[in-house]
């Protein structure tokens, strides 16, 4: 059985004037335990809406979402969310304080939570930086602290909404490598949202391409059966997967552009 199951999921928003906006319609997807799944699509296609429903931040209008066979009833510790920016870090807390925050809220003893927090700070490559505050950290370091904070709560899966979008190209490439290393070390299931085809191929086991919104659903899935050495942009097999994904999303980009004019 898949760890995450979305069956015929729809999300409808109602405006103050009473009109309906269908963000997602009849969206179905299974994600296996330990899988890194990238959801790719144009701006406004409903990628974040899907993630928010899996996270439990938003309810479904129709359909069913299950994690570990159980219906989602709201946010829970089995699903950890890493956001795009660093606004979710508490500026008055050190890196250690940020990473252990969730454990402290759950009543974990100080010695245990500090030990666990330091373990995950080291795992994300920031050993010795635990005393620093967010204002003293670079953008990439802040994202690592976000990831460490989520991992410290030991969720079954990570939900990541374009977490590296605000980083410069060099830092973004570093964070992609670090994320792959961390996921290999922890065997976490990941749902990763992106609009970047290269990023999806570098990271994912499978890539799901969404139709352009509104009323979006999954258009198709591409398996990324590449060895690590083949995930370089210049490798022939990387280029072949890129073309396959690009062919699938090209028409959706055109549709999205038409709707903005």
Please give the residue ranges for each predicted region.
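The feature captures the beta-strand-to-loop junction immediately N-terminal to the Walker
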Residues: 40-42
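Helix-to-loop junction immediately C-terminal to a conserved catalytic motif
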Residues: 55
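Conserved ABC transporter NBD signature motif
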Residues: 63-75
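Short coil-to-helix segment of the ABC ATPase nucleotide-binding domain corresponding to the Q-loop/switch region
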Residues: 93-101
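Conserved ABC ATPase "signature" region
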Residues: 100, 104, 111-129, 181
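Conserved ABC ATPase signature
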Residues: 133-137, 141
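A short, proline-enriched helix->beta-strand linker immediately N-terminal to the Walker B motif
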Residues: 152-156
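Catalytic Walker B motif of ABC-type/P-loop ATPase nucleotide-binding domains
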Residues: 158-161
């Amino acid at each position: 059985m898949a760890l995450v199951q979305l069956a015929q999921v729809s999300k409808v928003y109602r405006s103050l004037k009473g009109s309906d906006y269908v963000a997602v319609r009849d969206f179905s997807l299974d994600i296996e335990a330990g899988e890194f799944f990238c959801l790719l699509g144009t701006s406004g296609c409903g990628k974040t809406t899907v993630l928010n429903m899996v996270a439990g931040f938003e309810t479904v209008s129709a359909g069913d979402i299950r994690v570990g066979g159980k219906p989602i009833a709201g946010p829970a510790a089995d699903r950890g969310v890493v956001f795009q920016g660093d606004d979710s870090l508490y500026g008055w807390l050190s890196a250690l304080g940020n990473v252990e925050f969730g454990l402290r809220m759950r009543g974990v003893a100080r010695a245990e939570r500090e030990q666990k927090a330091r373990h995950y700070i080291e795992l994300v490559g920031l050993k010795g930086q635990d005393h620093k505050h967010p204002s003293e950290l670079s953008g990439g370091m802040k994202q690592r602290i976000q990831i460490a904070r989520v991992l410290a709560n030991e969720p079954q899966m990570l939900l990541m909404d374009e977490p590296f979008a605000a980083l410069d190209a060099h830092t973004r490439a570093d964070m992609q490598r670090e994320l792959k290393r961390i996921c290999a070390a922890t065997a976490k299931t990941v749902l990763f949202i992106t609009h970047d085809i290269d990023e999806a191929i570098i990271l994912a086991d499978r890539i799901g391409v969404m139709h352009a919104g509104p009323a979006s659903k999954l258009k198709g899935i591409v398996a990324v059966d590449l060895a690590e050495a083949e995930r370089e942009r210049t490798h022939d097999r990387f280029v072949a997967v890129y073309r396959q994904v690009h062919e699938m999303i090209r028409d959706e980009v055109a549709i999205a552009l038409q709707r903005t004019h």
